[in-house]
A protein has these predicted regions:
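N-terminal Rossmann-like FAD-binding beta1-loop-alpha1 element of flavoenzymes
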Residues: 1-26, 395-403
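A conserved FAD-binding loop/helix module that cradles the flavin
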Residues: 158, 162-178, 379-409
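An anion/pyrophosphate-binding glycine-rich loop and adjacent beta-alpha core
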Residues: 29-33, 39, 47, 51-54, ...
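Short hydrophobic core segments
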Residues: 2, 27, 130, 153-166, ...
Length: 412
């Protein structure tokens, strides 16, 4: 099994537990297995999401939603929670549905996976990766010849590719070598570069509910937005980046983002509220009389953006300027000039085409004995634990299926 990340570990454990006689070897090319698990979720590890109905769960996957429905019925968030609980790790649910270990420490998850692998008899080899695979008949039902990076050749009844996504994934070249189609990988879950005077100095400011859209597209999201020193981040931005991964890549990440800071109000509704405030409180300063749930410092910037001086009162605001303020509140346009990686959850879309994979077993339809799990597949979810859930699910399915084709003395 190639890839010592979440999917690879889960597959190796599932296989070894299902067939104690199988010889299961897990290869990790680096010396740091489970590295992504360690740093995800700000070091807390967002294990999964409290969305228990598979029909609802699949809606959080821009790629792979249809294909994951069956797998999630077999092993979804409920099974994930039970799996970790059965190994002494309790998970908690936060207000937004994200689930973390009660320790708030990813080391808990890392230790659990390492311990489960050791107890199941998985042989972990770090600093050793997979260099090549080819179909070959061997003893005891071996179907594949695997060449490791150090030159060692191993005959195996089954091989798993759980080597992750991204342009540099060795799994892509290995899959391509046996005939698989690779959907070109592009970034997903990224933040936006925005250089705008309305945001200067507001780093760390959070707007709890905004509406955003990429102008000229159908890409729209609602949720929290965070102002950063490079531009914009937060759940709404990350979800939009996931659903628009290919479209925004094609635009070279240069587009106009329209933000409704007064969501769910439309511009006309906001204008009427502002007119009412002007009539009722003509002597109040506009910069401090914020009728919406917009952070005070941001409201001051929006008022300035509408051409309203800091000391101006409502009485001095003309209808034209008031309309401009309503637009600033509900349809602020920001020029996006690029992207930055989301440090807590770095994901790509693209990978091995799902049409060429049996999603009930994760086995290749083109190369019997070859299996896939995790981000090497053309599957990705939005932020919130969904990508880890896909890793647990596909890893578990692959491990179970690989165990079913093992026999005494066979290796995987």
């Amino acid at each position: 099994m190639a890839g010592g990340g979440a999917a690879g570990f889960f597959a190796a454990i599932a296989c070894a537990e299902a067939d104690p006689l199988a010889e299961v070897t897990l290869l990790e090319a680096t010396t740091h297995p489970l590295a992504k698990v360690r740093i995800s979720g700000g070091g807390r590890c967002n294990v999964t999401h409290a969305c228990l109905d598979p029909r609802d769960l699949v809606r959080s996957y821009p790629r792979g939603s249809r294909e994951l429905l069956g797998p999630f019925h077999r092993f979804g968030p409920a099974e994930t929670v039970a799996w970790f609980k059965g190994r002494g790790v309790e998970l908690k649910t936060e207000g937004d549905g994200r689930m973390f270990p009660v320790t708030d420490d990813s080391a808990t998850i890392v230790a659990c996976l390492n311990d489960a692998a050791r107890k199941a008899g998985v042989r972990l080899r770090t600093g050793s990766g997979l260099k090549a695979i080819e179909k070959a008949e061997g003893p005891l039902g071996a179907r594949l010849k695997a060449t490791l990076t150090g030159g060692e050749v191993v005959m195996a009844s089954s091989v798993l590719l759980a080597t992750g996504g991204g342009k540099g994934s060795v799994g892509f070249s290995l899959a391509r070598a046996v005939g698989h189609t690779i959907v070109p990988p592009v970034p997903s879950l990224f933040t936006f570069h925005v250089d705008d005077p309305r945001l200067t100095g507001l780093e760390g400011l959070s707007a709890p509910r905004v509406g955003i859209e990429a102008q000229g597209t159908r890409l729209r999201e609602t949720g929290a937005l965070l102002v950063t020193h490079w531009g914009m981040s937060g759940p709404a931005i990350l979800r939009l980046s996931a659903w628009g991964a290919r479209e925004l890549h094609a635009a070279d990440y240069r587009f106009t983002l329209v933000v409704n800071w007064a969501e769910p109000r439309r511009t006309d509704e906001a204008r009427r509220e502002l007119e009412s405030d002007r009539a009722e409180h003509p002597k109040r300063k506009v910069s401090t009389a914020n009728p919406f749930a917009i952070p005070a410092r941001l409201w001051e910037r929006l008022a300035s953006g509408a051409g309203i001086p800091a000391e101006a009162t409502w009485a001095s605001v003309s209808n034209e300027v008031l309309r401009a303020l309503a637009l600033q509140a509900t349809a602020s346009a920001f020029a996006v000039s690029g992207k930055s990686m989301n440090k807590e959850e770095f994901v790509t879309c693209g990978g091995v085409s799902l049409a060429e994979v049996n999603m009930a077993t994760m086995e290749s339809r083109l190369c019997p004995g070859l299996y896939f799990a995790g981000e090497v597949l053309d599957i990705d979810g939005v932020t919130g634990g969904f990508n880890f859930q896909a890793a647990w699910t596909t890893g578990w399915q692959a491990g179970q299926a690989m165990a079913s084709c093992q026999g005494t003395g066979r290796s995987s």
